[in-house]
Amino acid sequence: MSYQRQSGKFPGWDGTPLFYQCWLADDPARGRNLIIHHGIGEHSGRYQPVVDTFSGEQVNIFALDARGHGRSPGKRGDSRALADFVPDLECFFEFLKSEFQVRQPVLLGHSMGGIVAIGFTLRFSNQWHLRSLVTSGAGLRPSLDFTQKIKATVGRLLRPLAPSLTVPIGLPLTLLSHDKQVIQSYDKDPLNHGMVSLQMGVGLMDAGEDLIRQADRVKIPVLVMHGEEDQIASMTGSIDFHEACSSPEKELRLYPGLFHEIFNETPAERQRVLADLHRWVLAHLPEVAPRETAATGASTVDAT
């Protein structure tokens, strides 16, 4: 079974038209729902391996491009961190509920998206009846070398004066994955960027430790995934977050030898990671609705 891919725009918290795309099952009204938030500098189109994993499973998949990323407007890499991203994600949920009748989804966040997904879960998990939270390579605690620590210190000092000033993130692309084709594709993709503003960078770093401190408030099922050789986001952040979560159902999956983008690692390793994701997500989504009781078809937004 192949997905029906659609795309369009939805209004962010301040009315900014943000890009989204979705992959709908053959009978969307009966499908279960997975929502994805990408990481810093990238976009929703880089999650095709995840999409392919659920082909034939009656799972609708929805992903947005955060402001300042991908096909969404805004200065590249500039936002007020969670102060923008979490309200935007809530607007996305509202849009999906209205336009696609999305109910009881699983929320997946990678890297920066992991921070956003955790922040959203702490505020809205009950309101939106989240079935589960999944994080991969969550950027709760960045792995900073000496030069990056200096940049972070200077950025914190300058943020009040020039919050939207953007600087290069400065991370080697070779730290994303062991798969050379993934690195080449990332480098050639015009929708990716390597910039971050002072307010966004410092805001995300501050948010990470704060979310770990609040992790005991996470009550829903949680799957925490992280590559043990991740040199972009330290796995200690994911370990501490998982340990602090008070959810009665939580799982920590650490992958020896894997870099930051565990869904984009070499084919053999990628399949192992995706199999774990597939197992968890299907176990925590509702049962497929019987065909005779399914809701009427959802309205959609054409690509723009």
Show where each model-derived region lies.
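Catalytic active-site module of serine/aspartate enzymes centered on a nucleophile-bearing elbow/loop
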Residues: 251-304
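Conserved alpha/beta-hydrolase
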Residues: 51-75
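Catalytic nucleophile-loop/oxyanion-hole region of alpha/beta-hydrolase
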Residues: 41-44, 70-104, 272-273
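Active-site glycine-rich loops that stabilize anionic/oxyanionic intermediates
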Residues: 38-42, 228
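N-terminal cap/lid segment of alpha/beta-hydrolase-fold proteins
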Residues: 1-26
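Short beta-strand/loop motif that positions the catalytic acidic residue
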Residues: 218, 224-226, 230
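Alpha/beta-hydrolase-fold enzymes
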Residues: 112-197
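Short alpha-helix in the alpha/beta-hydrolase fold that links the catalytic acid
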Residues: 220, 234-243
